[in-house]
Amino acid sequence: MAISILGAGAWGTAIAISLGSKKDVILWTHNETTFESINGKRESDKLPGCRISDNVSVKLAIEDIINASVTILAVPTQSLRKVCQQLHNCNLKKDVAIILACKGIEKSTLKLPSEIVNEILPNNPIAIFSGPSFAVEVARKLPYSMVLACQNNTLGSKLVSELQQENVKLEFSNDIIGVQICAALKNVFAIACGIVLGSKLGFNAHAALITKSMSEIKALYSAKIGDGSVDINTLLGPACLGDLIMTCTSLNSRNLSFGFKIGNSDNGFNVQQILSEGKSVIEGFSTAESIFNLAGKLKIKMPICEAVYRLLYESASIEDTLSVLIS
């Protein structure tokens, strides 16, 4: 099974390194510098020291990847619509399975990644690849656990077999909505946890915040499903609890580090300046706005997410934010 990966950031490249040890992989990037760097030294600047196998070919033209039987989309969620439109314009075959490896909610429409793909590429089957997985550890082939969510059991089982690696425990799920909700929310909660840690409020407050975060995940998950139901296996599995713990406790998390810098700013902070200092996308920044608006649309209360939103977008004070986060 030929595999293409769209997005040569840290995460997309890490997946390419992992799969490329035994399979032929096509990695697409729109960035000429990234293209030349990987082709020249077989290494990404985002993952120094992690060699990219010769089984991985890098392409600049999106037309060069459309013949693969599986396409993994590892682009930022806010760029997903544009990439899907490019695939549509290239007449992507209807039998090509699309695996979404991006996390977030589109700001302009409040749609999940799967809903964006269904809108633009309605005939292509969809799966979700999510769980606790820092790109650098995946690239170094350290052990990790993930969820492959797909509503088609036959296709899902086939994709699990294709993506399975010796160092990966890959679980199957039918819950594509729950897995995506959990994946998006954990980045916002990681920012909140970073603010608490940066403000030196201690690990007790940190642990309490993570615990309260699960209630907000359940609330949005239930409202999005529409009938009030949730899958306990999703909530307590790698895609939710596992990813939440990892993202909210390690400074390897871009979102936690972002929040930490805000909380640790003794003389005030500038959100845009902190964002510009990073080399990678802080998905939780965009997702905070999406979640705030989606919660309003669904008429549910999410005080932690609202507090993070008001801090990032409405210049709420650290003091007012912390009063919510540790209440």
Swiss-Prot record:
One of the GO biological process terms: glycerol-3-phosphate catabolic process
Catalytic activities: sn-glycerol 3-phosphate + NAD(+) = dihydroxyacetone phosphate + NADH + H(+); sn-glycerol 3-phosphate + NADP(+) = dihydroxyacetone phosphate + NADPH + H(+)
A single cellular component GO annotation: cytosol
Membership in a protein family: Belongs to the NAD-dependent glycerol-3-phosphate dehydrogenase family.
Compartment(s) where it occurs, according to its Swiss-Prot or TrEMBL record: Cytoplasm
Keywords linked to the UniProt accession: Cytoplasm, Lipid biosynthesis, Lipid metabolism, NAD, NADP, Nucleotide-binding, Oxidoreductase, Phospholipid biosynthesis, Phospholipid metabolism
Xref: PANTHER family: GLYCEROL-3-PHOSPHATE DEHYDROGENASE, GLYCEROL-3-PHOSPHATE DEHYDROGENASE [NAD(+)] 2, CHLOROPLASTIC
Protein name as annotated: Glycerol-3-phosphate dehydrogenase [NAD(P)+]
GO MF term list: glycerol-3-phosphate dehydrogenase [NAD(P)+] activity; NAD binding
Chain sites annotated for binding NADPH: 11, 30, 103, 135, 254, 281, 283
A Pfam family it matches: NAD_Gly3P_dh_C
Main subcellular location: cytoplasm
E.C. no: 1.1.1.94
Chain's role: Catalyzes the reduction of the glycolytic intermediate dihydroxyacetone phosphate (DHAP) to sn-glycerol 3-phosphate (G3P), the key precursor for phospholipid synthesis.
Name of the top EC class for this enzyme: oxidoreductase
Residue positions binding sn-glycerol 3-phosphate: 103, 131, 133, 186, 243, 253-255
Catalytic residue positions: 186 (proton acceptor)
